[in-house]
Amino acid sequence: MVKKTGAKRCTVIFAHPGFHFYRKPFEFSHFKFDKDIVDKIINIETHHCDPITFLGPGYGGKLLFIDEAVQSGWWLAPISSNDSHDYRNVPGKSRIGVVAEELSQKAIFSALKKRMTFASSFPIQLFASALVGDQQYPMGSHIPTSETLKIICDFVIPEEEKVGLERIEVLINGKVKAIKKLRDVSNADLTAVPQSTASGARPESGRIVIDINKPNIPSSPGYIYLRIFGYKAGKLIPSPIYVAPFYLK
């Protein structure tokens, strides 16, 4: 429809892929790449109602939906659906995190088009960046190939959420290449930075720095993204945070 109508000012997402099993034969399921509209389709849902749906393999049975779409050529960032399909019409717990310069329509749409988003099942402020040499790139960026690469993740969790981060997974070209446990990492990797809020609560915050060693740095084309799991009351939260990929150009 985007291509047929020639719409110039629009943004489109791949919404809840694979969710409606009963109508799967009629769903746009192949993620066929189209260079004429690649700049218009900007997001893919990784959380929708039942998060378990998106932890399983995608249409091909081997990769997650986000990986199938990205490996088809799309430049995408993850988002969540906030609707709950609840008869009481209450919002779901999933969140879309948009890293914008200010709280305005223009800034939010600019961030969306730059793919500076993340998807989470609980409120968290998060910003990931890639450090290539001395140049820093925000999440969703196309970054140059290099012999050195660091992924930096800054986060703030409101204290009232009582949620901790359990582990972080580094996925390179759709495969988990590293798992970092966050409960027992050294202070060099995770530094608490207390910050005050208007309510006086002190959120948990920190910075996670991950060195991607040379053998694991993908060549072009390639991509890297983070998947972060949380825990609450000692139990693992099954729906992870998805951070927008960094694309190797």
Residue ranges and their predicted role:
Residues 1-249:
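Extended, charged catalytic domains and RNA/DNA-binding interfaces, predominantly
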